[in-house]
From Swiss-Prot:
UniProt record similarity statement: Belongs to the fimbrial protein family.
InterPro entries found in the cross-reference section: Adhesion_dom_fimbrial, Adhesion_dom_fimbrial_sf, Adhesion_dom_sf, Bact_Fimbrial_Adh_Pro
Gene3D superfamilies the UniProt entry points to: Fimbrial-type adhesion domain (2.60.40.1090)
Organism from which the protein derives: Salmonella typhimurium (strain LT2 / SGSC1412 / ATCC 700720)
Location(s), subcellular: Fimbrium
NCBIfam families per UniProt: PRK15206.1
Protein name: Protein LpfD
The entry's keywords: Fimbrium, Signal
Length: 359
């Protein structure tokens, strides 16, 4: 009984070994990287400039990219018959939780706030960026240069995985930085036979860094606010240094701002920046040395241009949606004489910038 068992085991082992040798010599198969998987690590540090899009479901196509350089070598299973050639095929696997598919891009979760979609450059004869995940995408180079039978296969330069793009999807609106720890976003496998891939990726791509959504407010009525003072006689300014021009009116404007990413308890202040009059630093220059414009806050105090210590606190509403609030205040403006002299006749105008500070 013992002798028969030994003979049976020997025959079975020989049969399996023979079958494996025949398969390797007769067909194409997967490609294996020399020295293990090549790692590409990209750093992402980007800011969402349009904060109005900090909403659930918003997408930013080609939000960032990577171009890392670096090469690696591979050898592929090929038949011994050198007349047989085949394309080199790629498969990209994304090891993250799937979120959604939008316009042929598949988005995968990075953290609680964001998801990303990626594409990667398949070089060779294709030279195109392909959205991940995918399988059996050829590089359109039908040859045997990667075959393990060729000593030169280890000299072939491979770069796939080194270049690509990232698209961003907002899962939940957020304030400030969303940190991305080192996260694998794809494994790239290679083969010479469709759907027959090895277990070792040729390359893997990792990303890390942060995405920032800044806080801010913008004027609801647009980017500019015009205050027309009207027409005056030159004598309206004479002998009135530092005073409102005769017959002038204080123009009061109510300001409404749309603010993004302002947390509960945060205070918002308005201050003025601009070119001050050379003869009176409390006034905005109007292009005439004898005339300036003064801007007051709602409390009647002058908002001195370029003085950060002089500001007007805004009234801030509760949240109107997930990320937005409104803020409001009033300002008054009027022309003054800065010298008491009779100004030259002509048109005069000035420009001031309203600066918002968040504390």
């Amino acid at each position: 009984m013992l002798k028969k068992l030994i003979m049976f085991t020997g025959l079975l082992g020989g049969s399996v070994l023979f079958s494996g040798q025949a398969l390797a010599a007769a067909d194409f198969g997967p490609c294996t990287p020399e020295g293990g998987t090549h790692i590409f690590s990209a750093t992402i540090n980007k800011t969402v400039s349009d904060t109005s899009k900090n909403t659930t479901g918003a997408t930013f196509v080609d939000f960032d990219s990577w171009n890392l350089g670096g090469t690696y070598a591979m050898s592929c299973e090929c038949p011994d018959d050198t007349s047989l050639i085949n394309d080199t095929l790629f498969k990209a696997v994304v090891p993250l939780a799937f979120v959604t598919n939008i316009e042929s891009r598949s988005y995968y979760q990075i953290n609680n706030n964001i998801a990303i979609a990626s594409d990667v450059l398949i070089s060779g004869g294709r030279g195109e960026y392909v959205n991940t995940p995918f399988e059996n995408v050829g590089n359109l180079t039908n040859n045997r240069s990667q075959c393990s039978q060729n000593a030169s296969s280890k000299d072939a330069i491979w770069t796939s995985g080194g270049k690509g793009h990232l698209s961003l999807y907002i899962l939940h609106p957020f304030v400030g930085e969303s940190i991305i720890p080192s996260t694998k976003i794809m494994d790239l496998f290679v083969t010479k036979k469709p759907s027959v891939y090895g277990s070792i990726p040729a390359s893997s791509v990792y990303i890390s860094g942060s995405i920032t959504v800044p806080q801010g407010c913008e004027l609801s009525s647009g980017s500019t606010l015009e205050i027309p003072f009207g027409e005056f006689k030159a004598t309206d300014f004479k002998d009135r240094k530092g005073q409102v021009a005769k017959n002038a009116t204080k123009f009061t404007k109510e300001l409404q701002f749309k603010c993004t990413n302002i947390s509960d308890g945060v205070k918002i202040f308005l201050r003025i920046e601009g070119m001050p009059n050379a003869n009176d630093s409390n006034a905005i220059d109007m292009g005439n040395p004898d005339i300036g414009a003064v801007i007051e806050g709602a409390n009647g105090k002058i908002l001195v241009p370029n003085d950060a210590s002089v500001n007007q606190e805004l009234s801030v509403s509760g949240l109107v949606d997930d990320t937005h609030r409104t803020a409001s205040t009033t300002i008054s403006a009027y022309p003054i004489s800065t010298t008491g002299k009779l100004p030259a006749a002509g048109d005069f105008e000035g420009i001031a910038t309203m600066r918002i500070d968040v504390e």
